[in-house]
């Protein structure tokens, strides 16, 4: 598919004043194609209702459509079960949920949380807050000149005091893509939980 054909699906680029525009802020939010806009309008016009809480026709329709999306995401991500797919408002809320509901109960004073020094605020601030709340230590994983996590140096940091590791797959700042499989395998050797911020990678990897 050609670039101009792809652009034709986005109303923003079809207006005369925007036909030559290039939108670079997709890491924050993307322009929406017409098919997405049409479906949102269709929802609000024809079956706007709460999901999973009512038995009326509208609610059943909304719930069915909602769960169908969950199934599609499961297939796209090759998840084992659709219950592994949890919808939130975005990556920032998701990471905060992990920090406060999963990591906080297992962390104590002087424990270590490892992150890369190239994280977006959404994958840095939650760990800074948690470290302050619990007395844990936040440490940065070493990176090389290509802004990639150095596996050999990372291995030297992994020990019984490290209780959690969090890193991005693809940086929305530099575009650097981590060797995420290697990092996960390395961290798992020490039975340490690891979280991957895959917000950028899911569309590009």
Would you name each region that the model predicts?
Residues 1-205:
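Pyridoxal 5′-phosphate
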């Amino acid at each position: 598919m050609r670039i101009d054909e792809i652009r034709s699906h986005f109303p923003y680029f079809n207006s005369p004043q925007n036909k030559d525009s290039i939108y670079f802020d997709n890491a924050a939010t993307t322009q929406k194609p017409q098919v997405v806009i049409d479906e949102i309008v269709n929802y609000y016009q024809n079956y706007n209702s709460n999901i999973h809480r009512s038995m009326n026709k509208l609610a059943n329709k909304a719930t069915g459509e909602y769960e169908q999306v969950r199934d599609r995401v499961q297939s796209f991500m090759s998840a084992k079960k659709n219950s592994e797919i949890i919808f939130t408002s975005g990556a920032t809320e998701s990471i905060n949920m992990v920090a406060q509901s999963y990591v906080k109960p297992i962390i104590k004073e002087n424990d270590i949380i490892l992150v890369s020094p190239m994280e977006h605020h959404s994958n840095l601030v939650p760990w800074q807050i948690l470290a302050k709340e619990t007395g844990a230590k936040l440490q940065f994983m070493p990176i090389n000149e290509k802004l990639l996590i150095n596996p050999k140096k990372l291995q030297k940091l992994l020990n019984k005091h490290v209780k959690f590791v969090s890193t991005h797959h693809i940086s929305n700042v530099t575009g650097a893509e981590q060797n995420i499989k290697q990092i996960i395998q390395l961290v798992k050797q020490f039975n340490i939980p690891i979280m991957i911020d895959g917000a950028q990678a899911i569309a590009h990897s």
